Amino acid sequence: MATGKIVQIIGAVIDVEFPQDAVPKVYDALNVETGLVLEVQQQLGGGVVRCIAMGSSDGLKRGLSVTNTNNPISVPVGTKTLGRIMNVLGEPIDEQGEIGAEENWSIHRAPPSYEEQSNSTELLETGIKVIDLVCPFAKGGKVGLFGGAGVGKTVNMMELIRNIAIEHSGYSVFAGVGERTREGNDFYHEMKDSNVLDKVSLVYGQMNEPPGNRLRVALTGLTMAEKFRDEGRDVLFFVDNIYRYTLAGTEVSALLGRMPSAVGYQPTLAEEMGVLQERITSTKTGSITSVQAVYVPADDLTDPSPATTFAHLDSTVVLSRQIASLGIYPAVDPLESTSRQLDPLVVGEEHYNVARGVQTTLQRYKELKDIIAILGMDELSEEDKLVVARARKIERFLSQPFFVAEVFNGTPGKYVPLKETIRGFKGILDGEYDHIPEQAFYMAGTIDEVLEKAKKL
C-alpha cells in the first residue's frame, strides 16, 4: 500500500502528496494516521491528489502520513444491516456492537444496463387518501415530497414508512442526509415503537457532518438498498433530504475550486443528481421504490436544485404552506401534485375520473375565491354555490389523522384503503353527502367515519 503525506488543508478539502509512481485513482479511499478517511476527487499533478474528508478535519496538520487502500469506500450490505444505525462508512453508531455483515460493497457502482431494467405499472397503496387519489405511487417508481421549511415533509415521510412497512412488510433503507439529529432520533424511536425497526436499515449523515460526508451518505444507503434488490426483494429507499445532498455538493465544489453556476450551485449539479438517481431503479430481479423529501428554498420550485430533481421523478407530492395554514394536514396541494400513474390505463376509469373530478372542483373553487372575497357567496349562481360547498368538503376530506402524529394531537391514526378513498370522493362529487356539514369531513378516515361524526354534530 502506497503512503503519502498531507501537504495542504482547506476545511474539508485536503491535498495529499504521493510518490509519482503510486498516485491514487479518483474515488480511492485514503486512511490518515489519525483514523480519518479521505476520498480522492482530483489529481493535481506532481503526485498530489485533492481529497474530501469523510469526517472532521480538526486537529490535522501538514506532514501526517496517509495510506492508500486502493479501493473506493466500501460499506456492509445484507440483512445484518437491518435494525442498525450506521454512518457514511457503514460503521455502527447505535452502540449495538459490530454489524458483522458477510459482504461489503463499494458505494460507487454503475447503474443497471438497459436490458436489466424493468418497468412496472403496479400501484403501491400508501393508505394516505390525497396521495393514493391524486398522485398514486408506482411500485419501483421514484417519488418526490416537495415543500418549504416546516410544512411536513419529514412527518409525511415517517407516516409513509410506517404504513408501508406494516401493510406491505418489505425491507426499507432510510438515508438521513444533512437533516437534524433530533429527527433521526425521533425516527429511530418511532420505528422501534411501531415494531418495524427490524425491517429498516438506517444510515445517517446529519447536519453537523462535513460536506464530504453528507455528499456520500445517500450513496451508502443506496448501496444497501441495491443489495436487497439484487437478492430479488422489493425494497423501499427513503432519502431525507435530497436538497442537502445537492447543498453538500455545492460546498465541496467551491472548495475544489470549480466555478459556480446559477444561484451559486455547482456546475456539475445535473450530473451529480443523475449519478444518484439513475441507480435508483428496478431490475428484472427486484425493485427499489424511492421516496425523497426535497426542501424547496424560499418555497420557490424553480430553484435549480428542486427543478433538477423534478426531471427524475414519476410522482411529485407538493406540500403547500397555504394548505398547512388552513390546518389541513397532510398539506398536499392536489392541484400542484402530479403522477405518471394517473392514467386510465393504469389506475382504471373510475379512479381516474374521480381524481380529475376532485381537481376540477378544487380548481373552480380557486377561481371563485376572488369573487367570494369581493362580493360574498350570495352573488354566486346556484351551480357555483354547490361547487364551493363540495370543494370545501373535499378540501377537508383530504385531511387525515396520522399514526406518527398521535402523540401530538391525541387523534388515532387512520389507514384508508384505496377503494374506500375512491368511494368517499365519488360520493361527494355525486352529491350524496350535500346534506352533511363540512366540519364532519375534517380529520376523518373513511366516509363512514364522516357519517358517524355528522350524527354527533
Curated annotation (Swiss-Prot):
The EC category is translocase
Record's keyword annotation contains Translocase: yes
InterPro entries for this protein: AAA+_ATPase, ATP-synt_VA_C, ATP_synth_F1_bsu, ATPase_a/bsu_AS, ATPase_alpha/beta_chains, ATPase_F1/V1/A1_a/bsu_N, ATPase_F1/V1/A1_a/bsu_N_sf, ATPase_F1/V1/A1_a/bsu_nucl-bd
Q: Which reaction does it catalyse?
A: ATP + H2O + 4 H(+)(in) = ADP + phosphate + 5 H(+)(out)
Annotated Gene Ontology cellular components are:
plasma membrane; proton-transporting ATP synthase complex
Q: Which cell locations does it reside in? A: Cell inner membrane
Q: Which domain of life is it from?
A: Bacteria
Name the UniProt key words of this record, in alphabetical order: ATP synthesis, ATP-binding, Cell inner membrane, Cell membrane, CF(1), Hydrogen ion transport, Ion transport, Membrane, Nucleotide-binding, Translocase, Transport
Q: Which Gene3D superfamilies match?
A: 2.40.10.170, Bovine Mitochondrial F1-atpase, Atp Synthase Beta Chain, Chain D, domain 3, P-loop containing nucleotide triphosphate hydrolases
Which residues does the annotation say bind ATP? G147, G148, A149, G150, V151, G152, K153, T154
Fetch the Pfam families from UniProt: ATP-synt_ab (PF00006), ATP-synt_ab_N (PF02874), ATP-synt_VA_C (PF22919)
Q: Which PROSITE patterns match?
A: ATPASE_ALPHA_BETA
Q: How does it sit in the membrane?
A: Peripheral membrane protein
Q: What is its EC number?
A: 7.1.2.2
GO molecular function term, any single one: ATP hydrolysis activity
What family name appears in the similarity comment?
Belongs to the ATPase alpha/beta chains family.
Q: Which PANTHER family match?
A: ATP SYNTHASE (PTHR15184), ATP SYNTHASE SUBUNIT BETA, MITOCHONDRIAL (PTHR15184:SF71)
| Role summary | Produces ATP from ADP in the presence of a proton gradient across the membrane. The catalytic sites are hosted primarily by the beta subunits.
Subunit details: F-type ATPases have 2 components, CF(1) - the catalytic core - and CF(0) - the membrane proton channel. CF(1) has five subunits: alpha(3), beta(3), gamma(1), delta(1), epsilon(1). CF(0) has three main subunits: a(1), b(2) and c(9-12). The alpha and beta chains form an alternating ring which encloses part of the gamma chain. CF(1) is attached to CF(0) by a central stalk formed by the gamma and epsilon chains, while a peripheral stalk is formed by the delta and b chains.
State what protein this is by name: ATP synthase subunit beta
Lineage here is: Bacteria, Pseudomonadati, Pseudomonadota, Gammaproteobacteria, Pasteurellales
State the encoding gene: atpD
